């Protein structure tokens, strides 16, 4: 991120962030917007399996079981968690919050021989578990220059050979993992300019004309395999002119990508979002006419670095420790910073959920166990216990933004309500039987939706 962009932001954070106090956002109009764009009216007719409508005055309960909106978490990090005895509880806590999961497909992690892909068992287990839970799955990524094997990073291989390998890899992922609903295309494509000029993958990107054209090449290839797939451009710096140019190039050439991913890793003051900054980013990118994903969210529960140079020195210290086999330095999560994390997450999610262009919010590292950059940003601590931020998000996602109703039917088994978009179950007692049915509330609902009720538990 350019220093000229960072400096004005830093000044605005020094007092509040340095003291581990979050200045609560005004959130003016946020609740009204949520009421309008995330909820809708629903008209139902409750019908028994034999075709008879339930009598007028029948008491029923409605419970939302799933959000239409993507509340997501990453399973592409937290590498050590599956080795812990509390891994089952980790999964329970994850499933309690999220209906959407990011799954890792880092090339260099799963391939150590040219031409051979060996997907790790722990990644496969996470993918299968999330799929069984009915979560929407995001593959991360089809391509990323930070995690390519040595034969793709090579400064000596001809571009035509690189092109053959890269495109074969991209096609293989989409073809072999049809259960993945969405894919990050080439993750953080504009960042390739920060790599050595002779790096293989950089030479490959530049041979196609840069981030925009290479996005078109990848999209065209994967659309042949998965015409109805969803494919996302994603970057770490929303104010990077080359990211905006990539999007504009894709739109100009009518490249059929589906959404824009914006990351928000807040490891130093310049990367911490204010209310004004977040709303401005969402407004600016919504003008492109694509759904927005806040694709990687990190809010720290430890002391934050004042600027990128200080964070960079810290990262070098971590790298040096790993090279020499010394313990990796890690900042402590503290109660004050955990409160800061919870309050900022509450406000960040509320404002984002209130913007009509946003369809996904995805938290990055779920636990503080061996955290990325040695800086805890988890919803759970290093022992898998819920932190204040977990409870803050649970209150929003599972209580404030979820519909639970008890009411009575009118004539002909009819009823109506207003609720959050998503999936529902309806339950009522009749003649000693528990009857239950399911339905979805969508932004384009049927005029009247028949819900067939069937015996759930027999008599009792």
Regions found by a protein language model. Give the residues of each.
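Bacterial N-terminal signal peptides that target proteins for export
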Residues: 1-7
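Bacterial N-terminal signal peptides
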Residues: 7-16
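Beta-strand-rich domain onsets/edges
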Residues: 21-78, 112-113, 138, 152, ...
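Alpha-helical scaffolding within the catalytic cores
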Residues: 58, 79-92, 121-126, 168-173, ...
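Short Pro-Gly-centered beta-turn/loop motif in secreted/extracellular proteins
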Residues: 83-97, 415-423
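Aromatic- and acid-rich polysaccharide-binding/catalytic face
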Residues: 95-108, 113, 180-187, 191, ...
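Substrate-binding cleft and catalytic face of glycoside hydrolase catalytic domains
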Residues: 96, 100-116, 123-231, 236
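Aromatic-rich peripheral "rim/lid" segments of glycoside hydrolase catalytic domains that contact
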Residues: 184, 189-221, 277-291, 300-459
């Amino acid at each position: 991120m350019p220093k000229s962009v960072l400096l004005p932001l830093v000044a605005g954070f020094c007092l509040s962030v340095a003291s581990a106090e979050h200045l609560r956002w005004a959130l003016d109009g946020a609740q009204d917007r949520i009421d309008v764009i995330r909820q809708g009216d629903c008209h139902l007719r409750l019908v028994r399996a034999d075709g008879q409508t339930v009598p007028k005055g029948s008491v029923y309960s409605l419970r939302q079981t799933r959000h239409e909106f993507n509340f997501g978490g990453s399973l592409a990090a937290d590498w050590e968690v599956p080795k812990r005895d509390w891994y089952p509880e980790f999964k329970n806590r994850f499933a309690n919050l999220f209906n959407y999961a990011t799954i890792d497909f880092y090339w260099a992690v799963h391939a150590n021989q040219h031409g051979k892909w060996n997907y790790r068992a722990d990644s496969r287990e996470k993918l299968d578990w999330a799929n069984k839970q009915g979560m929407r799955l995001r593959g991360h990524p089809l391509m990323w220059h930070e995690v390519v094997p040595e034969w793709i990073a090579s400064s000596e291989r001809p571009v035509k050979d690189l092109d053959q390998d890269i495109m074969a890899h991209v096609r293989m992922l989409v073809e072999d993992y049809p259960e993945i609903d969405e894919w990050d295309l080439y993750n953080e494509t504009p960042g390739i300019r920060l790599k050595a000029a002779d790096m293989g993958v950089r030479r490959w990107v530049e041979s196609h004309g840069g981030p925009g054209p290479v996005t078109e090449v990848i999209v065209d290839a994967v659309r042949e395999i998965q015409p109805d797939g969803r494919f996302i451009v994603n970057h770490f710096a929303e104010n990077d002119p080359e990211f905006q140019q990539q999007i504009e190039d894709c739109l100009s050439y009518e490249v059929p990508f589906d959404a824009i991913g914006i990351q928000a890793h807040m490891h130093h003051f310049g990367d911490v979002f204010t209310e004004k900054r977040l709303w401005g980013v969402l407004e600016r990118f919504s003008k492109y006419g694509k759904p927005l994903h806040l694709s990687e969210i990190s809010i720290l529960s430890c002391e934050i670095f004042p600027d990128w140079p200080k964070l960079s020195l810290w990262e070098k210290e971590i790298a040096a420790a790993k090279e020499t086999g010394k313990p990796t330095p890690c900042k402590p999560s503290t109660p004050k910073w955990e409160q800061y994390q919870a309050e900022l997450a509450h406000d960040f999610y509320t404002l984002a959920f209130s913007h009509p262009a946003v369809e996904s919010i995805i938290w990055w590292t779920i636990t503080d166990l061996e955290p990325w950059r040695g800086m805890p940003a988890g919803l759970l601590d290093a022992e898998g216990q819920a932190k204040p931020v977990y409870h803050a998000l649970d209150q929003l996602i599972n209580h404030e933004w979820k519909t639970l109703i008890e009411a009575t039917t009118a004539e002909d088994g009819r009823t109506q309500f207003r609720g959050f978009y998503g999936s529902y179950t309806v339950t009522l007692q009749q003649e000693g039987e528990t009857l239950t049915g399911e339905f979805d509330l969508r932004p384009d609902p049927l005029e009247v939706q028949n819900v067939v009720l069937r015996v759930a538990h027999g008599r009792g």
